[in-house]
Amino acid sequence: MAVSYHFRPGERINEVELAAQLKVSRTPLREALNRLTTEGFLTTTANKGFFARVLEANTLFDLYELRAFLEQSAVRLACQRATDQEIAVLRDFLLEQDESGEISAGEMLKLDEEFHFRLVGLSQNEELLKTVRSISERIRFARWIDWQSRRLSHEQHLHITSLLADRKEDECAAFVLAHIQKHFDQILEIIRGAVTEIYTRNSDSPRKAR
């Protein structure tokens, strides 16, 4: 529900109503809501409860722009510093995913993040990696939205690794930029469509939080 925008951005979650709808007790529901808050899908305010996350396109743009800049720099450093063996290990990590069969959306996202962390790690710059990890935590919510494109991401990751192995620094940096920009464009498109839907859905009888 949180990912599919069942709740309007900023809307307060009615725990009693939601528990009845899902046919669960308040305790497991509260645990689930706390977990969703930790993962960035919801926000919480003391003495007021849980709220659907507000969509902040400008902030997302800034974070994705920064991420693209940093990862381009990282792959340039990786082309210069990573050993052939280290690049081979990264490629093996990707190939192992081909043999893992069907996996959940959550696992797809974890593997996607892990690839980018390993890629940036090849720059041998720990502060760069820490910054990219921090950005990933802040955009994880948005990346959930676009989880259906993970198969395409996997193919692009393999291409990035091939360019890295061939030490094609400029081409690799350009491809990483296009890779990140494409996902951001897809996320924005999905968000725009979702916002249009949730604000026109049941417009004659909007739901009220109790």
Curated annotation (Swiss-Prot):
What keywords sit in the KW lines?
DNA-binding, Transcription, Transcription regulation
GO molecular function annotation: DNA binding; DNA-binding transcription factor activity
Where is each HTH gntR-type domain found? 1-55
Q: What does this protein do?
A: Probable regulator for the expression of the NTA monooxygenase subunits.
Q: Where is the DNA-binding region?
A: 15-34
- The molecule here is called Nta operon transcriptional regulator
Q: Which InterPro entries match?
A: GntR_C (IPR011711), TF_FadR/GntR_C (IPR008920), Tscrpt_reg_HTH_GntR (IPR000524), WH-like_DNA-bd_sf (IPR036388), WH_DNA-bd_sf (IPR036390)
Q: Which PANTHER family does this chain map to? A: GNTR FAMILY REGULATORY PROTEIN, TRANSCRIPTIONAL REGULATOR, GNTR FAMILY
Top-rank taxon, per record: Bacteria
